[in-house]
């Protein structure tokens, strides 16, 4: 397993007093499941089937890392296994990036669009699986990231091979976040042995509390 370096950071932003169903983090707003916009999507019958039922905290670990270490190339971004898409939404809002939000489950996109609307941005939706992402799909991508995307044994190879293709395609920065599941570390071992990179321990406290690890590869 790659060695972990642990860094602790604190998010000081406070949730809006006007809306207790929202959290604020690094300049974006994140709705709880009880927020009216999320309830409206659920009432419309959209039910994600691959764990896309909430905002996962590994996305916040990635946002915090990117906030502190902004890549030079950040115009075009791919959010792989996006779920509700908050990391890509943050990139669109913070940097004005063109974001492609990718997920195998089309039912996540109404939720993502609701979150994007709350933040005053939009992203391009792409229904796709990791193993189907081709090298040519990645050739114009500056940053590829994914939060909580390696949660099953059968995802280890597809995620690792997607990263292989991203590196071959010249993607500049790759960041994968996870609460340190064994499957994440198995994938990270495969990738770092082949391409280098590092696994960083990362922690947030404050408005969002989260602990996990980030696989970071710089390919510029």
Q: For each predicted feature, which ranges?
A:
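S-adenosylmethionine-dependent methyltransferases
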Residues: 1-220
């Amino acid at each position: 397993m790659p060695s972990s370096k642990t860094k602790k950071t604190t998010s000081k932003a406070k949730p809006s007093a006007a809306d207790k169903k929202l959290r604020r983090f690094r300049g974006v707003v994140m709705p709880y499941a009880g927020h009216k916009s999320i309830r409206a999507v659920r009432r419309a019958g959209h039910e994600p089937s691959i764990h896309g039922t909430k905002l996962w905290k590994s996305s916040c670990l990635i946002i915090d890392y990117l906030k502190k270490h902004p890549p030079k190339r950040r115009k075009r971004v791919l959010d792989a296994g996006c779920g509700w898409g908050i990391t890509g939404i943050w990139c669109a809002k913070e940097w004005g990036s063109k974001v492609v939000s990718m997920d195998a489950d089309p039912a996540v996109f109404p939720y993502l669009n609701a979150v994007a609307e709350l933040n005053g941005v939009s992203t391009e939706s792409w229904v796709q699986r990791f193993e189907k992402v081709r090298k040519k799909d990645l050739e114009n991508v500056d940053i590829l990231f994914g939060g909580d995307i390696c949660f099953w044994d059968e995802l280890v190879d597809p995620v690792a091979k997607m990263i292989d293709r991203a590196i071959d395609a010249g993607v500049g920065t790759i960041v994968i976040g996870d609460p340190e599941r064994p499957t994440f570390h198995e994938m990270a071992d495969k990738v770092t042995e082949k391409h280098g990179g590092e696994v960083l321990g990362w922690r947030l406290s404050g408005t969002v509390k989260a602990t996990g690890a980030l696989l970071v590869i710089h390919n510029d």
